[in-house]
Amino acid sequence: VNHSKGKILVIRGGAIGDFILTLPVFQQLRKYFPQTHLEVLGYPKVAQLAVESGWADACKSIESPGLVRFFAPRGPTPPDWLHYFSQFDIIISYLFDPDQLFQTNVQQAGSHHYIQGPHRPNDNTRLHAIDSLLQPLEKLAIYDVGMIPDLSRLARCQTPAKESKVQIAIHPGSGSPSKNWPLERWTHWCQAMCKDSHYHFMIVAGEADREAGETLARHLPDHCRTLHMNTPLPSVARAIAGSRLFVGHDSGISHLAAALGVPSLVLWGPTNLEVWQPRGKHVTVIESDQGLGGITSRQVSREAHRLMDGGS
């Protein structure tokens, strides 16, 4: 594709963390094709982050019923979708497509350059997920590694809080209970911090974390916390960006906080750290040989204060 024009489509489903780990793909495409229209086909609630942060120009929903036809062998494909795909010079797909049915059907739309990326990075390697997701760009002669997801543009849009309290954003949940620090530890730590009226907790919770978020909120004084339940992701991002510190687990929200550049303390469980940890000098990971239950409130307090004091 000519570096001064053309259109590139990146197809990426997945949850919040999966998408944020793919942001460096958009960042590199924007760097090497600055004048090219860059579009994302994904879940709008998540993919809109790429548009609002300036890495993509437009977002289209992957949840359209018409796309189902593209996963059927020799099935009739909707003309409107064929026309849509025909507009792009390069299509990079991270969809699970083991039999190449989707690719075969999309290629009916024209002679664009189709690049298949990994649906999910390999947990059994030592290669970070970001570098795995960047590998397809080698077909475009882009070989950069070590990239960090960057949502700093969203952070710059955040107006600093006028109140004098120090805001700490926390996410007491994740996609799996095995990745969570025990809720009683969260409660103990937050209650101890709330004894200092200087701190205010912003609790982030989605549908999967509802119980953890609500339970923790009930155990904290009203003046010491706010609860953001099922808040739209760009709004959550801006709220986290206004925080002095983020504390969470191996979750998409932790990747979001890291991408915003917020000093982050991540309590790590059983997942492969080399592959999945949020990147950045401002990110500190705590893990224990005894698992998450081996992480103490005292450890978390010590690291939290160090990060809020500007430590790294």
Question: Where are the predicted features?
Answer:
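Catalytic machinery of carbohydrate-active enzymes
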Residues: V1-S312
